[in-house]
């Protein structure tokens, strides 16, 4: 992956647009284009009590996710990145797509306040590496500073 180029492209894509939905929509489409072996990428936005489906690319998804459920809920509740090599081994996993095997979820935080999560699923086991995580942390940093600030 050409990480620095992708980061510059995303920054350019979102920096002059103020609409959050438009920016998150384009970000999910952008990630869907550049990431291999994924079957879902998108956002869940925190409404103060639960995660609500936001812009995404992939099959129809669960609309409401309580913070006590699933990989997304765990990442949101603990405000930390979680990589799951095998979602079927994750207690409380919410199976929106039975084809998903691994998942990475990154919280979106502004001044330590939860705004939502970036969720990416793959049909491959152990799809997401530490390199992917570090790259996606940079993506989330752009989201936090260019979209939610």
Each predicted region: which residue ranges?
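Regulatory loop-to-helix N-cap segments in sensory/regulatory domains
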Residues: 121-139, 146-149
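Regulatory sensory and allosteric helical modules in signal-transduction proteins
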Residues: 46-96
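Intrinsically disordered, low-complexity terminal regulatory regions
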Residues: 1-54, 138, 143-149
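Sensory-domain boundary capping and coupling elements
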Residues: 109-122
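Short loop/turn motifs at secondary-structure junctions and domain boundaries
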Residues: 35, 96-100
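A short, aliphatic-rich beta-strand micro-motif
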Residues: 102-109
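Short hydrophobic/aromatic beta-strand element in the GNAT-like acyltransferase core
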Residues: 40, 105, 117
